[in-house]
Regions:
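Amphipathic, interaction-prone secondary-structure segments
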Residues: 2-29
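Mixed-charge, Lys/Arg-enriched low-complexity segments
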Residues: 34-80
Length: 80
């Protein structure tokens, strides 16, 4: 499993990665919304559970400045 965090400022984070069970996934967190995870998690999407498409994942990764090498591996359907 991989898990990468991009600090978006203002207590917000973009988290993304690859998991053998979930496939590609991403989450958006707002850490100013409370103390519990269920209060702070804004978006939670994965290939397996939410049918996250490769196109949507690439779009979101570009929007939140994910690492270029991760985008390249994603485009080739490889884990990162």
């Amino acid at each position: 499993m991989s898990r990468y965090v991009v600090d978006l400022g203002e207590n917000k984070e973009f988290v993304y990665g690859f998991d053998h069970a979930l496939g590609y996934f991403y989450e958006l967190w707002d850490n100013s919304r409370g103390d519990e995870d269920y209060e702070r998690l804004i978006v939670d999407k994965s290939y397996f559970i939410n049918k996250l498409s490769k196109g949507e994942m690439i779009e979101v990764m570009e929007k939140y400045n994910a690492r270029k090498e991760h985008l390249e591996r994603m485009a080739m359907d490889l884990p990162f």
